[in-house]
């Protein structure tokens, strides 16, 4: 009997160990690329998840999704809204909902389980939810757009004018910033949920019973307000109470209206309307009944303490105008007016892009009185930001705070090239310590010049207000970070930080060019920096919004303006440059390849085709001659228009690339006639391009610039027999210039990609490891903490631009070696090809791809190459190890011939190539 018990115990232990070794788990469940999203606008939302396993080479073989309108049903295994059944598929991304019709404003719950390639079934996941938005415009009824005051028709201006001067009439009366109030009663019924659907233009802050709702900044996102506006969805269940409740809404101008006050900075003048709002709150009770609170002329309105609001000029707040308790029940509103109902303009859609938020705070590293009564706070980092002020002083005292990227020779705030004059001002109420943050404007800065107050601890004979604390609050788009990079070379770590700060500072509601002077969505950066940004941040939602902005800004003739949303009708090439407008073609394709969502191509096809047809109409014998060219290349003159490359070359190369992208999209979508048309047209453009720009006896394009040759190679415009000579010309030009960069905004991205692609990362290293010539190292030496607009860090240009940050892509794709596979999407299959260059002896690079984390960590130690690779579950990688000798390689301590789950594919360019499935791999290459 004792022997039997021992036997059974051993058997149970073996069974337990076996089951533990065969597990598949589900992590990072997402609906519409978000965790528990609010305001889902699609009637067929997409689901996704990532997998984890405790064995290598594991894939998904099937999945099942359940969706219910009650979480209790899901607990019982019932999907009364959708039960997908067991679907044989290895797809874990972009699974489209296919159940019963979804209702506006309704909340749904979902869970999923999977089977892996061994037949092992996972447990059901935890329950997640998604809240639908208002799917149809009539779902807003009876809510109305309301305002405090309206703009006379004669004063509406959109798109606006840059440096408008006398093009725009002065306003009879400038917009005042309103605050709205709505009180409502909730009886004794128990509240199940309460959701607010709200748009306040230009920007709004919502409060419920005196508490701000959410942690967003500058809601809603920017849009082309004559075509569309965005609304935001908030769950306010926990903010409500029995009895009287109060909704409070404050509005600022944003891009809806640029004040015409000539004493403050204005990049442009435009007026779509004065601030306005619309709101619907739906309260659902446990008995199934609902109550809606809708905006209308029964809402109360009065001017707010925000006395000036400009996205370009700053923000003023007068605390003496505060009405204490206005957001709380019981407040007397007899002195307030009824809101004015106004007509609807454009359509409303949900803000599904990530909002802006306060992401990081900085304390001052020094405070100096550079002139009597003027104090400079240095926060040590140039960033897109607002200030956070704590101050104490007398009623009516006023403090002015001027942000700046750098200082004048006299030690004062220098805004000459970042948009001036810009300031924040605060007028004190005199009620103890006062705390204020701007709500409706931000700037790019490192320094703040303070006038009218003194720092705590400073002698104060005039009795000025005392600043108890002043911080810099970095504001940015809340897109999820997905990348990490560190290496043994400190200069390159600093360059990574330099570029990353410029990316974060320009990830706003659009990808801006700079966070101060313009704050506009100049489109060339969006496609040229796409991979550089996407390695660091999940930008699927942000870029999907950019595509919508381009659709709403596209002209009837197909032209996509250089900026989207288009707020100003810039002249000539500044409105119509193919290197910029091509984002309308390239971004949908990029999103499909990076994130695997083919619906982006379907939804963008008209945008793409209309634009290439427009470009075709502008050609002369298949060549384009308009545009800005290789903007800010490094030539003999002050940077601006292309200096070293004929301006017809880059737009024609871009046009050729666009044609090929549209052709590939046409084929993918089954549009065969379009595929043939654009393929044939591309072939004609290639012939014309080479006839126009290629000098065969010299082996280069145009005048032989880095940009001309690199973009021609990357776009496959170079004939096969000429590729080698063209590459040699690029490298020769770089070496002749002592490894100097000349390529600009358009060309540098393609220069790096071509050099990496052709195995010349040593050249990339040499170009970017020096500090005595204009480039990244030079900018660091000049004291830059974010990437500057010009290679030479000119003080006549912005010091926070991400348009030249393309080296970020090489950090991941070169040093880390993480590269997309041309035949795959969303990193389902990918390449790992690490580059050991210069004085690098280690690097650790990680990227949380759509399927999971890819990690490439290597070290050269004692002449050995020690390499750790992580491949996500449900994916495959092709690893290029830097040796031709298989016998010198071990994995997990075993010779490669003894490793059964790794497939040897051969060699290429002194590399051994292996195909691996998911899991962790530990390689050592002996000398």
What are these regions (language model features)?
Residues 1-25:
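Bacterial Sec-dependent N-terminal signal peptides
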Residues 203, 294-303, 447, 455-498, ...:
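Active-site acid/base region of carbohydrate-active enzymes
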Residues 247, 317-318, 518, 536, ...:
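C-terminal capping/lid segments that line or modulate ligand- or cofactor-binding pockets
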């Amino acid at each position: 009997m004792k022997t039997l018990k021992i036997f059974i115990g051993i058997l149970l232990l073996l069974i337990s160990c076996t089951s533990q070794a065969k597990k598949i788990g589900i992590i990072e469940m997402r609906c519409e690329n978000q965790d528990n999203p609010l305001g889902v606008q699609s009637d067929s939302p997409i689901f996704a998840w990532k997998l984890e396993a405790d064995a290598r080479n594991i894939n998904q073989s099937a999945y099942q999704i359940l969706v219910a309108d009650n979480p209790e049903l899901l607990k019982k295994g019932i999907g009364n809204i959708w039960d997908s059944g067991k679907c044989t598929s290895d797809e874990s991304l972009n699974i489209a909902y296919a159940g019963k019709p979804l209702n506006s404003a309704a909340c749904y719950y979902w869970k999923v389980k999977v089977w892996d390639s061994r037949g092992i079934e996972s447990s059901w996941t935890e329950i997640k939810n998604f809240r639908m938005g208002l799917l149809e415009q009539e779902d807003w009824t009876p809510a109305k757009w309301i305002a405090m005051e309206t703009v006379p028709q004669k004063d509406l201006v959109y798109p606006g004018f840059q440096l408008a001067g006398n093009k725009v009439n002065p306003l009879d009366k400038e917009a005042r910033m309103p605050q709205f109030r709505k009180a409502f009663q909730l009886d004794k019924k128990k509240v199940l949920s309460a959701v607010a659907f709200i748009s306040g233009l230009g920007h709004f802050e919502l409060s419920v019973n005196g508490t701000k709702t959410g942690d967003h900044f500058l809601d809603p996102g920017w849009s082309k307000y004559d075509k569309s506006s965005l609304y935001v969805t908030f769950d306010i269940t926990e903010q409500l109470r029995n009895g009287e409740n109060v909704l409070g809404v404050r509005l600022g101008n944003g891009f809806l209206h640029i004040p015409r006050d000539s004493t403050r900075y204005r990049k442009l003048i435009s007026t779509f309307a004065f601030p306005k709002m619309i709101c619907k709150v739906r309260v659902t009770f446990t008995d199934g009944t609902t109550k809606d609170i809708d905006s209308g002329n029964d809402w109360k309105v009065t001017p707010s303490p925000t006395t000036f609001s400009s996205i370009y000029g700053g923000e003023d707040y007068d605390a003496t105008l505060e009405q204490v308790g206005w957001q709380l029940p019981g407040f007397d509103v007899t002195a307030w007016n009824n809101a004015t109902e106004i007509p609807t303009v454009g359509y409303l859609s949900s803000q599904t892009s990530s909002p802006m938020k306060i992401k990081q705070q900085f304390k001052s590293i020094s405070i100096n009185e550079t002139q009597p009564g003027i104090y400079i706070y240095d926060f040590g980092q140039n960033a897109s930001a607002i200030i956070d002020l704590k101050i104490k002083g007398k009623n009516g005292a006023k403090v002015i705070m001027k942000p700046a990227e750098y200082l004048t020779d006299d030690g004062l705030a220098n805004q000459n090239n970042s948009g001036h004059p810009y300031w924040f001002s605060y007028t004190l109420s005199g009620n103890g310590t006062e705390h204020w943050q701007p709500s409706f404007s931000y700037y790019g800065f490192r320094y703040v010049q303070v006038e009218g107050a003194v720092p705590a601890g400073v002698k104060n004979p005039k009795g000025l207000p005392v600043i108890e604390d002043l911080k810099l609050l970095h504001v940015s788009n809340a897109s999820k970070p997905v990348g990490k990079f560190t290496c043994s070379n400190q200069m390159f770590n600093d360059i990574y930080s330099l570029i990353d700060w410029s990316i974060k500072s320009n990830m706003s509601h659009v990808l801006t060019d700079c966070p101060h002077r313009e704050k506009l969505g100049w489109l060339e950066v969006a496609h040229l920096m796409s991979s550089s940004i996407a390695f660091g941040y999940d930008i699927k939602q942000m870029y999907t919004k950019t595509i919508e902005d381009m659709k709403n800004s596209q002209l009837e003739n197909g032209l996509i303006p250089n900026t989207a949303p288009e707020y100003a009708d810039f002249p000539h090439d500044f409105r119509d440059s193919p290197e910029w407008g091509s984002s309308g073609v390239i971004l949908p394709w990029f999103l499909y390849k990076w994130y695997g969502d083919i619906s982006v191509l379907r939804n963008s096809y008209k945008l793409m085709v209309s634009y290439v047809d427009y470009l075709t109409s502008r050609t002369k014998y298949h060549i384009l001659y308009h545009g800005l060219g290789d903007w800010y290349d490094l030539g003999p003159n002050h940077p601006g228009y292309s200096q070293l490359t004929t301006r017809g070359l880059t737009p024609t190369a871009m046009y050729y690339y666009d044609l090929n992208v549209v052709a590939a999209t046409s084929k993918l979508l089954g549009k065969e006639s379009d595929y043939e048309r654009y393929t044939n047209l591309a072939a004609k453009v290639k012939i014309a391009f080479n006839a126009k720009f290629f000098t065969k006896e010299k082996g280069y394009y145009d005048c032989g610039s880095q940009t001309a040759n690199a973009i021609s190679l990357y776009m496959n415009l170079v004939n096969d027999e000429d590729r080698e000579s063209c590459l040699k010309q690029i490298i020769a030009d770089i070496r002749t210039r002592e490894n100097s960069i000349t390529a600009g905004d358009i060309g540098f991205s393609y220069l790096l990609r071509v050099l990496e692609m052709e195995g010349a990362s040593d050249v990339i290293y040499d170009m970017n490891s020096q500090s005595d010539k204009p480039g990244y190292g030079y900018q660091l030496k000049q004291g830059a903490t974010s990437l500057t607009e010009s290679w030479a860090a000119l003080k006549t240009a912005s010091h926070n631009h991400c348009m030249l940050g393309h080296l970020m892509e090489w950090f991941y794709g070169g040093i880390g070696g993480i590269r997309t596979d041309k035949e795959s999407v969303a990193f389902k299959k990918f390449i790992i090809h690490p580059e050991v260059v210069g004085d690098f002896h280690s690097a650790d690079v990680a990227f949380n791809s759509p399927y999971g984390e890819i990690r490439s960590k290597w070290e050269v130690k004692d002449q050995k190459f020690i390499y750790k690779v992580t491949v996500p579950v449900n994916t495959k990688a092709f690893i290029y190890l830097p040796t031709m000798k298989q016998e010198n390689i071990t994995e997990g301590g075993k010779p490669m011939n003894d490793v059964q789950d790794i497939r040897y594919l051969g060699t290429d360019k002194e590399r051994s190539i292996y195909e691996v499935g998911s899991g962790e791999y530990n390689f050592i290459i002996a000398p």
